[in-house]
Swiss-Prot record:
Feature: compositional bias, Basic and acidic residues: 171-188, 209-224, 238-249, 724-738
Sequence ranges assigned to domain Ras-GEF in this UniProt record: 1232-1454
PANTHER family cross-referenced by the UniProt entry: GUANINE NUCLEOTIDE EXCHANGE FACTOR, RAS GUANINE NUCLEOTIDE EXCHANGE FACTOR C
Any GO molecular function: guanyl-nucleotide exchange factor activity
Gene3D superfamilies assigned: Dbl homology (DH) domain, Ras guanine-nucleotide exchange factors catalytic domain, Regulator of chromosome condensation 1/beta-lactamase-inhibitor protein II, Son of sevenless (SoS) protein Chain: S domain 1
Function: Promotes the exchange of Ras-bound GDP by GTP.
Short name of any one Pfam family annotated for the protein: RasGEF_N
Name recorded for this polypeptide: Ras guanine nucleotide exchange factor C
SUPFAM superfamilies: DBL homology domain (DH-domain) (SSF48065), Ras GEF (SSF48366), RCC1/BLIP-II (SSF50985)
Any one of the GO CC terms: plasma membrane
Length: 1457
């Protein structure tokens, strides 16, 4: 673990040592802890200091040594030890051995221990001088940094030792405990005559022998020891406290010596005089160090030794270890949290105890100082300074300002769970949610109703009825948040200094989820806050920031309103925030640091001169940043500097990933609850049995006459039933909808046997909506009768209103869809709060994580996932049904999808692919397997960083989640329960596989418990994008060998379906020759299949054999049929390139598409007449078409339809027919518009149905490898050119206006025939530049025709990605000719916008989306127009008439007008 600091460094708070510049604008590593081999687990920042807590519970501080105003310091020392040891003199030399005393302690405390640590550590001891007389104990009552002197030597025969020296031998020092330098080294200095004289004569004169009884000695001893109970021991053994009150005598049993008790006052005087003389002597011999010795007298904290000679003596530029012996006897004494003010420190332990020390000028330490004791210490300090030189005394603070530095003392408050500090105030939050505050109250920042300082913890009475969950303080104000969701603010409330001394509520939640308007003030909504509970508060100089549990940060100045920092944070989800005076530091869930605010001293960690927010690159995954296995786990901010803690343990990384995952999941639930549920409930109606009965049982008879017979051109008795509610079988029971009226046949109807049912459909069910085109589209223009019903369009709004009344959605239905979502949200909030609390006080070595998952209340709450999985399918089906019958609800859901994209922090793309409603409803089912997988990873960590007990707990928790997962999987029957992670959901609530490796996908394909009914069809259609047919066949054979004993026949069914619906893999055809696919090797695949058939005796293989040879026989028959055909001189050859006519009389036959087939087919020049003949032949065999559709309905896999309608290049024979010539005087305008529309519709559908499904794969249309798509496109463009030519052929504007009206009428008839392609081709012709410029002609157009044109133009406009046309195409009912351009655009977007491989797995989601588009196309290809006829003459004219190109058209148009 590493520590990085940046910002203002001249005060030493960065801990980097002496730096050249005052600021450090980029993060720098604190190498001190690496050198001493210590791991930092917590950091905290104050105004001028930084605190580090290591994993062995040692405390380190760097920064300014003392408060310049009050002389206090955070580098506390208990009164220094005054121990002396035996001194021996000989005749020649005097060898003296002495421990640290008041004089030497200053230098000795700055020593480094064996680890190289700088320490400030001392403990008061009693001084015992043994001289055959009574003993004396000299204790220190001062808690300041002043070192009380002791006797450093005595007369030659006198032995000086500590009581512990007598009791036990010296204890070997621990590596982490600092040791003292030898006092012999300190005392062996150049001879000083003045000092030697004092040591020999002064002691003889001042010491007296006292003789008293044993009782008197014991009483004096007890009184002195009472003051020693709270003082720390400074012996080499740091774990032993002085407790010598039980000693009644210190007389050595082996020696008959009399202890001498020193008079306390005399001893202090002697000590002071000795020290002063020694200091003066040293100044004479070592003049280069007078300042250091002088400051030792002036109550300065001891200075650590520093290798840098230029270091400021008033600043610790590198961390100094502070003794924590005061915690040894406290229960649960592990440090939980540290907080700092200007010059005071607050420490919270796991046991809920609070310790403070430092400046207590305004009572911020939380306890009263003993005034008598303080005055006595100040008097002693003044006496010791009175004999100093004027130059030395002038540099010390005045006696009135002297204030002792308090040693750590426990505050009288218990069960504290959280602490916070301002500059000179402190707050503590107890386990019961009670808030206590103390310290300065100048601005009312204590919230006690006045501005009087408090020196002891005082409860905030205003919040006595609230359970406070978090608190934050600054120099002028404070803020808190309660469990009830209320936020309170108090203190200085504006820039003028107005004071709010009582906590006042702030309606924070009214701002957290509100809409943020655009900056231009136009009232257009920009984005929405994500809402949620507040997790953390941070206060700066007149600023407040809040972090929600959703990971969103809001900040505002006082006074002001909360504003989300989404743009500043670049949509990062935030886990932790801290604030300095004028800057905010955010730690994201992904482990990156984002800083916002002022950057004057480099506190943002970036070299940018501007104050723009951004990521700190050195602490991110940038190439110039951290290593790949490192991440930031904790942050802290001081007044003008910042600190980041970096870790690389796998356990921590997995734990943070769990937090990130659960926060993202909570945002998903939040979107479901606050957007979808609330929006849908706003339009729902209370449950009404009467209305619901009418809605479910409604029929055409309940509709008003204005909505009966909606299709233009049909008589009133037409049997066009509008499907309502849940009438799922309505389209099966009706008669044939094709009716003859005035010689015209309308194409809205279709034989009931030809309709595609929901149960057999593989495409999106939205195509089969019961409202369909006959409902929504006809309600828009249904009253248009050809060209003459345009004025009835005004009834549309009335019809729509009635329609909505009969499609009411009840509140119970909405509640059924979102059942248990609210309970899941509360459970996730609780679980996430546990994780956040654990991670905020995290230590991967000592902390346990598994107990959270085994919490009984939490595990009991997780049972909610079982009923949710049970009702998931029902919820999805309810949603599907109400969307079918209520168009308004569908629009609301679309609006919710748009709002979801800008609601709160953006969802993590690693866990979320789609944010539509059905995907969000699936997210709870995917949450449990994610937790299970992560627990397994945590339990298998063998790095040695995890507590063994925690591993056992985690593995046990994983077992429980596995049982829960298997129970949930009973509703879906996945091969492996975690497969649901790679699934998406369709409208029916069936999870669908989204990705996996090829073996995994093949296992899913052949598993007997497959839960995705469309998986096989999607796979067989698209597998060529990620593997070859031969490779797939090998995998299937291998799987078959493994599953032989199961006798489930799954592999055989897959191969059989492959042969039946994709036989082109086993034989060559013209399309494969045209595309020249290198992976297409039908000969090798056929050999493998035949070998497999003949080598296996399994009975189920006969099914494959039957289908395979049946298809081969059909191909041979088609070859013989082609070879037997004789061409005559009167026959006109051939159709366009690769346009092969579907032979309806032999619809079960297939062409042999080997290379030999090309030699047997006569090829000549293409003519348009051949196309006309082919289409005419298609329409002269309606009975055969109906038979084909009957076969389609009998096939459960409609999308492939035995290749009769979709594989025209492979399943057809060439049919050459004589084409009648076009009459010489034929005029298209003489034909009825409906007749032209019918003919055009049949032609458009033919070209559309000719397109092979393989042409839609791999963007072949953009590579000139899709001939049928090109033919259909050319036909579309030719139709537009025919419209342009016919209009420009008119002689004057009046005729041109009439021609315009004629084609508008044809377009309307095409629209009512569901021919969207024909409608678009005509409208695009009318919108061409050469036609639009004919202003005179357009001005003479009748008003009704102009209204109709504008209406159709809005439908087929490409604006907003063909939004109107797409809406019709998703609700229309076959037969239909859709607009091909929208499908090609969708396929291009899917191909280019989705990678084929994600994380080493095949992105099957991409293949599924491609297949969905193709299945929609196939549905419209399969259902033909069997109830209308085409006119051969019109057909020939549309195919072969002369047309103008663009240049000719523009020239003629310019000449006309």
């Amino acid at each position: 673990m590493s520590v990085f600091t940046f910002g203002h460094g001249s005060n030493g708070a960065l801990g980097l040592g002496k730096i050249t510049d005052d600021t450090c604008p980029t993060p720098q590593k604190v190498n001190y802890f690496t050198e001493i081999d210590k791991r930092v687990k917590k950091v905290a920042c104050g105004s001028y200091h930084t605190v580090f807590v290591t994993d062995d519970e040692h405390l380190y501080i760097c920064g300014i040594k003392k408060d310049p105003k009050h002389g206090t310091t955070l580098f506390y020392t208990s009164p220094p030890p005054t121990t002396t040891t035996t001194t021996t003199t000989t005749s020649s030399t005097s060898a003296t051995t002495t421990t640290t005393n008041g004089m030497v302690n200053e230098k000795n405390n700055n020593n480094k221990n064996n680890n190289g640590e700088k320490i400030v550590n001392s403990k008061p001891e009693s001084v015992i001088i043994k001289d055959g007389a009574s003993n004396t104990t000299n204790d220190s009552t001062s808690s300041s940094s002043t070192s009380t002197s002791s006797l450093s030597s005595s007369l030659p025969p006198t032995n000086i030792e500590t009581p512990r020296d007598k009791k036990k031998p010296p204890i070997k020092l621990d590596k982490g405990i600092p040791h003292h330098r030898s006092t012999r080294e300190l005392i062996q200095r150049p001879e000083s005559p003045l000092l030697n004289k004092l040591l020999t004569s002064k002691a003889e004169m001042e010491f007296k022998h006292y003789e008293s009884n044993e009782k008197s000695k014991d009483e004096m001893k007890d009184n002195e020891n009472e003051n020693e109970e709270d003082e720390d021991d400074d012996d080499d053994d740091s774990t032993i406290r002085q407790n010598e009150d039980k000693e009644s005598s210190l007389i050595d049993d082996n020696e008959s010596e009399t202890s001498l008790r020193i008079n306390k006052k005399d001893a202090e005087n002697i000590t002071n005089n000795i020290r002063l003389i020694k200091e003066l002597d040293e100044q004479q011999q070592q003049p280069q160090q007078p300042q250091q010795n002088l400051k030792g007298i002036m109550n300065q904290p001891p200075l650590p030794t520093n290798d840098d000679l230029d270091e400021d003596p008033n600043i610790h530029f590198t961390p100094i270890r502070i003794s924590t012996h005061f915690l040894e006897n406290s229960p649960l004494n592990t440090i939980k949290q540290v907080a700092l003010g200007n010059y005071h420190i607050v420490l919270l332990t796991e046991g809920g105890n609070v310790w403070t020390w430092g400046s207590n000028s305004n009572g911020q330490l939380g306890y009263l100082v003993d005034t008598q004791q303080q005055q006595q210490q100040q008097l002693q300090q003044q006496q010791s300074m009175s004999s100093l030189q004027p130059s030395a005394s002038s540099s010390s603070p005045s006696s009135s300002s002297l204030q002792t530095t308090c040693t750590p003392k426990m505050v009288e408050i218990k069960c504290v769970k959280y602490i916070a500090t301002g500059v000179k105030n402190t707050a503590a939050l107890t386990e019961w949610g009670e808030l206590y505050m103390w310290g300065i109250n100048e601005h009312g920042e204590l919230g006690l109703g006045d501005t009087i300082d408090r020196r002891t913890p005082t409860r905030v009475i205003r919040l006595k009825n609230e359970v406070v969950s978090t608190i934050a303080c600054s120099s002028t104000h404070s803020a808190c948040y309660t469990e009830s969701g209320k936020m309170y603010v108090w203190g200085q409330s504006d820039e003028t200094g107005k004071i709010q001394a009582i906590p006042s509520p702030l309606p924070i939640h009214s701002y957290l989820d509100r809409e943020i308007k655009s900056p231009n003030g136009g009232g257009v909504g920009g984005f929405f806050g994500g809402g949620g509970k507040i997790k953390q508060l941070a206060c700066g100089q007149r600023c407040i920031a809040v972090l929600t549990q959703m990971g969103e940060v809001f900040m505002w100045e006082i006074p002001g309103i909360p504003i989300p920092l989404r743009n500043a944070l670049e949509n990062h989800s935030v886990r932790n925030i801290v604030m300095g005076n004028f800057h905010l530091v955010c730690l994201t869930d992904s482990g990156e640091v984002v800083t916002i605010g002022r950057n004057k001293t480099g506190q943002l960690g970036r070299t940018d001169a501007e104050n723009e927010p951004g990521i700190v690159k050195q602490l991110s995954f940038d190439p110039d940043g951290l290593n790949s296995d490192e991440f930031v786990v904790s942050i802290a901010a001081g007044e003008f500097h910042s600190v980041a803690l970096v870790e690389n343990t796998p356990k921590t990384k997995l734990a943070l990933q769990l937090v990130r995952m659960q926060r993202n999941y909570l945002r998903q639930l939040n979107i479901l609850n606050n957007i979808y549920y609330k929006s849908m409930m706003s339009m729902a109606s209370p449950y009404d049995p009467v209305v619901l009965s009418m809605m479910n049982n409604g029929s055409a008879s309940t509709l008003p006459p204005s909505l009966k017979g909606l299709s233009g051109g049909l008589p009133d008795n037409a049997n066009n039933t509008i499907k309502n509610g849940k009438d799922k079988d309505n389209h099966h029971n009706g008669d044939s909808n094709g009716h003859h009226s005035n010689g015209h046949y309308h194409g809205n109807g279709n034989n009931g046997n030809n309709s595609i049912t929901t149960s057999n459909s593989i495409s999106s069910p939205s195509l089969l909506g019961s409202g369909g085109t006959l409902k929504s589209r006809s309600a828009s223009i249904a009253t248009i009768r050809g060209l003459f019903g345009i004025n009835h369009m005004l009834h549309h709004s009335q019809s729509q209103s009635f329609q909505e009344e009969n499609s009411t959605v009840t509140e119970d239905e909405i509640k059924e869809i979102f059942s248990d979502i609210e309970a899941l949200s509360k459970l996730t909030e609780k679980f996430l709060s546990y994780l956040d609390q654990r991670m905020d006080n995290w230590d991967p070595v000592s902390k346990v994580l598994g107990d959270i998952f085994l919490d009984e209340a939490l595990m009991a709450a997780y049972r909610i996932y079982i009923p949710y999985s049970d009702s998931y399918n029902t919820s999805c089906m309810t949603l599907f049904n109400i969307r079918r019958r209520n168009e308004r609800l569908s629009n609301i859901i679309k609006d919710c999808e748009k709002k979801s994209k800008s609601f709160g922090v953006k969802l993590d793309q690693e866990f979320v692919k789609e944010i539509d409603l059905k995907s969000l409803l699936l997210s709870p089912l995917q949450n449990i397997p994610r937790i299970y997988i992560l627990l397994r990873e945590l339990g298998s960590d063998d790095s040695g960083n995890i507590n063994p007990r925690d591993i056992d707990l985690i593995n046990f928790a994983a077992t429980k989640f596995q049982v829960l997962l298997e129970r949930m999987n009973q509703n879906f029957q996945f091969v492996n329960a975690v497969e649901i992670l790679h699934c998406s959901s369709n409208e029916y609530g069936n999870p669908q596989i989204m990705g996996g490796s090829l073996p995994q996908l093949v296992d899913k394909l052949t598993h007997h418990n497959i839960s995705d009914p469309n998986f096989r069809d999607v796979f067989l259609l698209t597998f060529r994008a990620f593997t070859t047919p031969c490779n797939l066949f090998d995998l299937l054979v291998e799987t078959f060998q493994r599953q032989k004993h199961l006798k489930n026949g799954r592999v055989v069914n897959v191969i059989t379906s492959w042969v039946v619906h994709h036989f082109y893999d086993f034989e060559k055809d013209k399309l494969s020759d045209f595309t020249q696919d290198p992976n297409h090797n039908p000969q090798l695949l056929s050999e493998k299949l035949e070998q497999f058939i003949y080598s296996e005796d399994h009975q189920s293989v006969s099914q494959i054999k039957l289908q395979y040879f049946s298809h081969r026989k059909r191909l041979e028959s088609s070859i013989n049929l082609i070879d037997n055909q004789k061409l005559t001189q009167n026959e006109i050859t051939t159709p366009p390139p690769l346009q092969i006519q579907n032979n309806n009389q032999n619809n079960n036959l297939e062409n042999n598409n080997n290379n030999n087939n090309n030699n047997n087919t006569t090829t000549t020049t293409t003519t348009p007449n051949d196309n006309i003949n082919d289409i005419n032949n298609n329409n002269n065999n309606n009975n055969n078409n109906n038979n084909n559709n009957n076969n389609n309905n009998n096939n459960n896999n409609n999308n492939n339809n035995n290749n009769n309608n979709n594989n025209n290049l492979t399943n057809s024979t060439i049919k050459l027919v004589v084409q009648p010539p076009i009459p010489i005087n034929f005029n298209l305008l003489d034909s009825q518009p409906i007749e032209v529309a019918q003919t055009l519709t049949i032609m458009d559908h033919h070209y559309f149905a000719m397109i092979d499904k393989r042409e839609f794969l791999g963007q072949r249309w953009a590579k000139n490898k899709s001939p049928n798509i090109q033919i259909s496109t050319d036909h579309f463009n030719r139709t537009s050119q025919v419209v342009v030519t016919e209009i420009l052929k008119s002689k004057n504007s009046k005729q041109r206006s009439a021609t315009l009206g004629y084609f508008i009428s044809v377009a309307y008839c095409c629209f009512e025939l569901n021919n969207l392609s024909g409608t678009a081709s005509i409208i695009y012709g009318l919108n061409s530049a050469s036609i639009q410029r004919l202003k005179k002609s357009w001005s003479k157009l009748p008003k009704e025709s102009m209204i109709a044109f504008e209406y159709l133009d809005k439908i087929v406009t490409p604006m907003k990605n063909y939004i109107s046309l797409r809406h019709l195409m998703t609700t229309i009912q076959p037969p239909c000719v859709p607009f091909l351009g929208t499908y090609l655009k969708d396929l291009t977007f899917i191909e280019e916008g989705n990678p084929s491989i994600i994380g080493g797995l095949i992105n099957f989601y991409k293949q599924r989306k491609i297949a969905e588009v193709i299945f929609q196309i196939q549905q419209h290809q399969q259902v033909v127009y069997s109830a209308i006829r085409s006119n051969p003459t019109i057909k020939a004219f549309l195919m072969s008439s002369h047309t103008f190109d663009d240049k000719q058209a523009q020239k003629i148009s310019s000449e006309a007008e």
